């Protein structure tokens, strides 16, 4: 690898919330040594202080990176979300400041799918309430409302990476799988796509949710939808906490419209393991409540640590932004002996003309150039002759619309 414009020992990584040590191993193997590793999230004031001199930050789901936080992150180049979701990050604020955000959208899919399937089996057998009764000295030895999973209908809402893997596992246990997605998807195995949300609700013994957090999915399962689930059905949510109205779900459990539920995500979650967890579902024996641990397995966390840290290394080493959630995706092959310039700018007319004008007027030959844009930002990676890189950088940073410009190596 070519020598970077900023020595790797001076590039600071701030890793919070005890991300898996595999991330640290990847960073060290790539030559990065300035790594601050903290096992918890930080209070806002301390986060502002710590992020001020960080070039990269790694977080999980508790740390909230707001526009106000980004205002204190003058050196920040990229964010690594060591999880699936990125709703804890103000993606627009990051993009406007030229900060790329990466995540691990697929690394914990198996873990979540296994948890959902296990919960389905436990709820069909009535294990949660039988377990609770035994702990209180009771003894409910009965086959009433106790069922095998084989032959049952599973309704999957959201047929993405988790939904599809769950579909395959469920079919292997003899379930009939139906799924609803806003996009037309290729069914795996013998799964069947249905045309509306109401169809899987009304026909399924178990309904499980696997949708992202968007304006469209917020409270998409309210009282009307919960009552549309067949009587004696089961609802599982391991997606996002804002998808299900929990008060309506609690009512449906109490009046026995549903025989059980499993919830892993909540509208408001404790910031730490020492805080009190509040929910209208507490105290209901036939509801499995788990503290947002769908993807919290040793295997998933190790994979997430590897995936996200490798993306951060690639972005730091050569400017590759492939799979960024808020940034144009660029990957320019290296040109030996050349220097690489990165230019992030507002997506407005004339910027590329001005960039190329700089090279033309100063007699600088371009060895390689890759531009991509999204609705707000343009990102171009340029390889030039080594002797001209400083001159080019000096000119590029003054172009109207420039957000960030630097010599990478």
Can you annotate each of these PLM segments?
Residues 52, 65-70, 178, 182-279, ...:
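Rossmann-like adenosine-cofactor binding region
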Residues 97-153, 165-172, 320-325:
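Phosphate-binding beta-alpha-beta segment of Rossmann-like dinucleotide-binding domains, i.e.
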Residues 101, 223, 232-234, 239-334, ...:
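Rossmann-like dinucleotide-binding domain for NAD(H)/NADP(H)
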Residues 322-409:
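A conserved regulatory-domain signal marking ACT and ACT-like small-molecule sensing domains
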Residues 159-160:
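Glycine-rich Rossmann-fold phosphate-binding loop(s) that bind the pyrophosphate
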Residues 1-102, 200-202, 222-228, 371-379, ...:
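An N-terminal-biased, well-structured beta-alpha scaffold segment characteristic
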Residues 20, 163-164:
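N-terminal Rossmann-fold NAD(P) dinucleotide-binding loop
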Residues 13-15, 156, 343:
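Hydrophobic Val/Ile/Leu positions in short beta-strands of Rossmann-like dinucleotide-binding domains
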